[in-house]
């Protein structure tokens, strides 16, 4: 779960603490944002996180490996209009990899070239816009964001990624709304790094992606491991993401407080 306070101790600052666990992932994060760091609305934020992911523990076939990530960063947001802002960030992240029971050949080849432990420093620049009528459970308006992130000199690996996310809420009646959403991404290595780190690959599938499919179960398939040549190809991800969908949103029957729950057909 997570705890978020938008007016921490009456200061106007936002503090969030998240602790989530699943069968294959543990995620701990902390963030602090001063939304009015300057009088003209420039925001300043800090964050720290620890994430442990072990795909070996999933009950269905995905590429077998685990990665422990520890990092933190600082970001500055600058408003350019009432509905949009620019964001700039710097972060540091340490990743430690472990191979699993049936690690596929693509992973073993990357580890042979680059090793298992990496420390990377990243810079990011982004633009975001929102005209949503509310922050949660919106029923009209749109939001979108575009972010470019790249490792910088001093990093063990060299790669970048460009991500776009957008959604539109189109009311049909007072109770029924169509939601159109899409996520686009492109990532690539550069310089001395010969290929994109496999753990930076894009996947699809799952509740927040392509519903009806298991988490991270969609995407390019791997080469079977040499230790198990009869193994069927497993989802390995790729450096390009194109996904989208349409949902029909309407109030959940027999629920009095409609501000926290609603039904979605997809």
Language-model features: where?
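Gram-negative/organellar outer-membrane beta-barrel architecture
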Residues: 1-145, 178, 208-212, 216-227
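C-terminal outer-membrane beta-barrel translocator/porin domains of Gram-negative envelope proteins
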Residues: 1, 101-266
């Amino acid at each position: 779960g997570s705890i978020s306070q938008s007016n921490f101790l009456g200061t106007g600052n936002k503090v969030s603490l998240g602790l989530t666990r699943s069968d294959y992932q543990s995620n701990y994060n902390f963030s602090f944002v001063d939304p009015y760091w300057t009088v003209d609305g420039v925001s300043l934020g800090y964050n720290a996180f620890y994430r442990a992911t072990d795909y070996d523990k999933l009950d269905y076939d995905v590429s077998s490996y685990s990665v422990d990530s520890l990092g933190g960063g600082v970001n500055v947001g600058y408003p350019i209009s009432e509905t949009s802002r620019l964001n700039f960030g710097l972060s540091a992240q340490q990743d430690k990899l472990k191979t699993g029971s049936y690690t596929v050949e693509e992973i073993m080849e990357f580890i042979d070239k680059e090793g298992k432990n990496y420390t990377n420093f990243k810079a990011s620049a982004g633009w975001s816009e929102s005209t949503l009528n509310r922050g949660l459970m919106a029923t009209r308006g749109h939001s979108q964001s575009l972010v470019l992130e790249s490792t910088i000199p001093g990093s063990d690996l060299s790669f970048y990624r460009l991500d776009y996310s957008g959604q539109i809420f189109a009311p049909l009646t007072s109770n029924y709304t169509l939601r159109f959403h899409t996520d686009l991404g492109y990532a690539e290595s550069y310089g001395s790094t010969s290929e994109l780190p496999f753990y930076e690959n894009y996947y699809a599938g799952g509740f927040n992606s392509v519903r009806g499919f298991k988490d991270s179960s969609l995407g390019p398939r791997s080469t079977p491991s040499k230790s198990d040549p009869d193994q069927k190809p497993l989802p390995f991800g790729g450096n390009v993401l194109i996904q989208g969908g349409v949902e029909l949103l309407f109030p959940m029957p027999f629920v009095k407080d409609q501000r926290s729950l609603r039904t979605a057909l997809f």
